[in-house]
Amino acid sequence: MTTKYVYWGEAKVKLTWKCEQQLPPRERITSVHGFCFKADKLLLVNVTPRGWDFPGGHIEHEETPEECLKREAYEEGYVTGSCSLLGYIIVDHNENPNWDERSPYPKLGYQVFYRMDIDQLHDFKAKHESLERILVNPSVVTKYHHKWNELYQEILDYALVLK
């Protein structure tokens, strides 16, 4: 497990990666993300306004986390594939004096991560948030991703082991 403190605006938030094969409580999952691979290449999508990123986003009301990733991977990268759960980042606002009970996010929430093995690269249409997609060698992801950090690196390293 790796822990990192970050500032989201003025808010100090504790993030902890947990490699886990069971999902956290559904009502506390705020987003789902995926490291998506075609052969040995990692999919990155250029998402407005974030820049280069891995596919992911907020979970919708009736979705399972895996369904969320599959939807986001298709909307952002026009890919489909099979998924394996990697674990989750615990998003802890307990040390955040700006957190408020009316927040749309729980005081203790989760960002779930999957590995997707891409079965099909569909025609890229750029109809959603993404401007483009690329497949890169995972060793160069830091040259593209807008906010790469040690948590993402630990998750990627684990995803690469699951080949």
List each model region and its residues.
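Acidic, metal-coordinating catalytic segment for phosphate/diphosphate chemistry
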Residues: 1-33
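Active-site-adjacent beta-strand/loop module that shapes the phosphate/pyrophosphate-binding cleft
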Residues: 81, 91-122
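Charge-rich, low-complexity intrinsically disordered segments
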Residues: 153-163
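Short helix-loop capping/hinge motifs at secondary-structure junctions, enriched
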Residues: 42, 120-125
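Conserved Nudix-box catalytic region and its N-terminal flanking loop in Nudix hydrolases
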Residues: 37-75, 79
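NUDIX/MutT-family hydrolases
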Residues: 112-115, 124-155
